[in-house]
Amino acid sequence: MSMSSAHPPSMAGAFPANATTHADGILLTAISSERTHLRANSGPHTSAAGAVPVDVYVDFHSGPCQRFEAAVGSTLDEMFGAGDITLAYHPVAVLDALSTTRYSSRAAASSGCASDGGRFREYVRALFAHQPPEYSAGLTNDELVEIGAKVGLTDSAFAECVRTEHYEEWTTWVTVRAGDRGVNWWPTVHVAAEPVRANAEAIRAAVSGAASAEADQAW
């Protein structure tokens, strides 16, 4: 499917819940407390105003992205839970050639369905935990529905959204927008709109630097 980078999908229901300003990603609003380093009784947590923006570009069929999630995901969740950052994920689909069923596109589209169901971050973790081998058929849509059920996405609307690939066009838009921004490697991490190395130490340092710069400007 081709799409002009100047024109996002215009059909009704084209964007998932909590889409970013340009509808090219998902902005987290909360993460279940049992999956972060927050106190067990703290409940869902949202980022504070003035937090440093962090953008993460991933393909759900990318081995490096899976390793990034395993190594850095908890750090991102911790900083988000503390209110230090806002966190946006941009699920691109550039590795469809690594499966026989367009798995990258289908997985990315299904993450939009998870955002509608209020369990986006939990579903992202589960997708990476169940990542199929490269050059395989990938997971079926029914298997994606089953993964969603494991993180609390049991509503029939989620299942229908995944099985009909409702957010296929949105996935294309996210991928086009990433290319327009010069993103050509996955994972890619931007802190305050600047690219940084995709490891916990570099991200923490960049967030600290951006927060200090903002504080200096406030004076």
Residue ranges and their predicted role:
Residues 1-99, 209-219:
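Extracytoplasmic thiol/disulfide redox context detector
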Residues 3-17, 149-219:
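C-terminal cap of thioredoxin/glutaredoxin-like
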Residues 51-52, 83-86, 117-122, 153-155, ...:
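Loop/turn elements at helix/coil->beta-strand transitions in domains of secreted/extracellular proteins
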Residues 58, 91-93, 127, 162, ...:
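A mature extracytoplasmic/lumenal domain signature
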Residues 65, 97-98, 137, 197-199:
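Extracytoplasmic/secreted cell-surface and envelope-processing proteins
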Residues 67, 71-75, 105-109, 119-122, ...:
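Extracytoplasmic/secreted proteins, especially bacterial periplasmic and envelope-associated proteins
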Residues 67-70, 77, 81, 112-119, ...:
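Sec-exported extracytoplasmic/periplasmic mature domains
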Residues 78-116, 120-146:
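Structural microenvironment flanking redox-active thiols in thiol-disulfide oxidoreductases
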